[in-house]
UniProtKB/Swiss-Prot annotation:
It comes from Homo sapiens. Residues 388-408 are annotated as: Fusion peptide. A motif (CX6CC) lies at residues 471-479. This is HERV-H_2q24.3 provirus ancestral Env polyprotein. It comes from the Eukaryota. Specific enzymatic cleavages in vivo yield the mature SU and TM proteins. Contains the CKS-17 immunosuppressive domain present in many retroviral envelope proteins. As a synthetic peptide, it inhibits immune function in vitro and in vivo. Retroviral envelope proteins mediate receptor recognition and membrane fusion during early infection. Endogenous envelope proteins may have kept, lost or modified their original function during evolution. This endogenous envelope protein has lost its original fusogenic properties but has immunosuppressive properties in vivo. SU mediates receptor recognition. One of its GO terms (cellular component) is plasma membrane. The lineage of its organism: Eukaryota, Metazoa, Chordata, Craniata, Vertebrata. The record marks R387, V388 as: Cleavage. A motif (CKS-17) lies at residues 454-470.
């Protein structure tokens, strides 16, 4: 635990703390991996936390300790407020797979082509892409071609208060993400898998497409005539059962939606469009037409549509349908928002996911203590500190509770940006590069020193040739140099390759300036395990210190070894020459 932030105003308490800390650093923690100051990437979090405390509790912030855990998995989740469910943007990722790469000739699939496209349907992937362009021509602002990030970002996340809304999909087969406790969900929307297919005709072909999922409406209230009248459908064409063509002659029809029950009787309410999986944040004192236009892709849309969509084609009504391709829909949240499923957080929902999730903001585990408290530094002694400092969770200091979050008045400003992972990855790859360069210089010095020693040895052998050579002249065992520089250079090459790989990955994460809204999907590659990388980044300074100490010890050993060679001292690494003359 590292203590940072605003120090207590009591000077004697502060001096006593620093004295204990200095004593522990000098005598009890010789291998302390982290320096006294906090890592630079946590400075912004500490400053933001202090600002929030100053705004919510001024009497407390003037004399308190802020305590932040440096554990890579210790995070606290703050539930997203009601408006986040209706206004948070989503990025869409598409992937296709084929059972038969060349099932139909290209000329028969020309009906699926978007006429504005210049791509010729010469392979199945382009044929499927042409078909998708027909459906997705109105969704181009929301489609992201970069690979999404899967896998949990954190695995020990706690949520201290109940979230206003959760989404649950319990499939018999799927990718399990985790299940939130019912006590952490004020209301849960249950999704059910489709059991039928729908038919769609395009050109001369009859398509059979997997039907949409459904939402359990048993606990929803039908008040659409009062609150959703005038709410227009978004103009999208994601799927036949989501298509909503718009034109000047035929404006979109108003949608109908159901009320999500709220434990509090207030004017802010959530309504759900169960047909198009949209959440509307309504105020019952104002008509919905006065609210701004909402995005057609929302977190509920992502949860409902994240799956595999099979497409079969049929030449005639009497022929057997043949599988054309499978469309995999995957969605990712915007910066700062995360899906919390059980105790794990995700940026993206994989296709065919299963579990119970909600929207949250992430913050490191931050606590605070009264500035008059004496904070003991744990020493490595047989006795243990019996007195426990009363650390208060940050949410209590900010005045957050389950009711305030459910009402939508909770805080949504504290979040851990994924940019942290990118900067730490850059720093770690730079450290590895510096280590490899240092080892290269040291090995070059060792090779140069060995060449000098061998050259001196040859000179001494020439000077003592009349006496039978240096070894016979000294009447000692002869020593020879065993060159193992090749192994060192191989290890240096591995370090450089690893550093180059990390640098390439970090550069690939950087978002181009023309795609600022999609930079989060570049943060980490798909196959990189996030938790091990984060642990490596956390202990990078410790590894660098140990390697530096190893290099110093190695230099000292090589120097001593070279001196022994120069003064012809014995060494177990050298081999004696035979002293007897060979027999005739």
């Amino acid at each position: 635990m590292i203590f940072a932030g605003k120090a207590p105003s009591n000077t004697s308490t502060l001096m006593k703390f620093y004295s204990l800390l200095l004593y522990s650093l000098l005598f009890s923690f010789p291998f302390l991996c982290h320096p006294l100051p906090l890592p630079s990437y946590l400075h912004h979090t500490i400053n933001l936390t202090h600002s929030l405390l100053a705004a919510s509790n001024p009497s407390l912030v003037n004399n308190c300790w802020l305590c932040i855990s440096l554990s890579s998995s210790a995070y606290t989740a703050v539930p997203a407020v009601q408006t986040d469910w209706a206004t948070s943007p989503i990025s869409l990722h598409l992937r296709t797979s084929f059972n038969s790469p060349h099932l139909y000739p290209p000329e028969e699939l020309i009906y699926f082509l978007d006429r504005s496209s210049k791509t010729s349907p010469d392979i199945s992937h382009q044929q499927a892409a042409a078909l998708l362009r027909t459906y997705l021509k109105n969704l181009s602002p929301y489609i992201n071609s970069t690979p999404p990030i899967f896998g949990p970002l954190t695995t020990q996340t706690t949520i201290p208060v109940a979230a206003p809304l959760c989404i649950s999909w319990q499939r018999p087969t799927g990718i399990p993400l985790g299940n939130l406790s019912p006590s952490r969900c004020s209301f849960t929307l249950h999704l059910r898998s489709p059991t039928t297919n729908i038919n769609e005709t395009i050109g001369a072909f009859q398509l059979h497409i997997t039907d949409k999922p459904s939402i359990n409406t048993d606990k929803l209230k039908n008040i659409s005539s009062n609150y959703c009248l005038g709410r227009h459908l978004p103009c999208i064409s994601l799927h036949p059962w989501l298509s909503s063509p718009c034109s000047s002659d035929s404006p979109p029809r108003p949608s109908s939606c159901l009320l999500i029950p709220s434990p509090e009787n207030n004017s802010e309410r959530l309504l759900v469009d169960t047909r198009r999986f949209l959440i509307h944040h309504e105020n019952r004192t104002f008509p919905s037409t006065q609210l701004p236009h909402q995005s057609p892709l929302q977190p509920l849309t992502a949860a409902a549509l994240a799956g595999s969509l099979g497409v079969w084609v049929q030449d005639t009504p009497f022929s057997t349908p043949s599988h054309l391709f499978t469309l995999h829909l995957q969605f990712c949240l915007a910066q700062g928002l995360f899906f919390l499923c059980g105790s794990s957080t995700y940026m993206c929902l994989p296709a065919n996911w299963t579990g119970t999730c909600t929207l949250v903001f992430l913050t490191p585990k931050i606590q605070f203590a009264n500035g008059t408290e004496e904070l003991p530094v744990p020493l490595m002694t047989p006795t243990q500190q019996k007195r426990v400092i009363p650390l208060i969770p940050l949410m209590v200091g900010l005045g957050l509770s389950a009711s305030t979050v459910a009402l939508g008045t909770g805080i949504a400003g504290i979040s851990t940006s994924v940019m942290t992972f990118r900067s730490l990855s850059n720093d770690f790859s730079a450290s590895i590069t510096d280590i490899s360069q240092t080892l290269s210089v040291l090995q070059a010095q060792v090779d140069s020193l060995a060449a000098v020693v061998l050259q001196n040895r040859r000179g001494l052998d020439l000077l003592t040739a009349e006496k039978g050579g240096l070894c016979i002249f000294l009447n000692e065992e002869c020593c020879f140099y065993l060159n193992q520089s090749g192994l060192v250079y191989d290890n240096i090459k591995k370090l450089k390759d690893r550093a180059q790989k990390l640098a390439n990955q970090a550069s690939n994460y950087a978002e181009p300036p023309w795609a600022l809204s999609n930079w989060m999907s570049w943060v980490l590659p798909i196959v990189s395990p996030l938790i091990p990388i984060f642990l490596l980044l956390l202990f990078g300074p410790c590894i660098f210190r140990l390697v530096s100490q190893f290099i110093q010890n190695r230099i000292q050993a090589i120097t001593n070894h070279s001196i022994r060679q120069m003064f012809l001292l014995t060494s177990p690494q050298y081999h004696p020459l035979p002293q007897d003359l060979p027999s005739a």
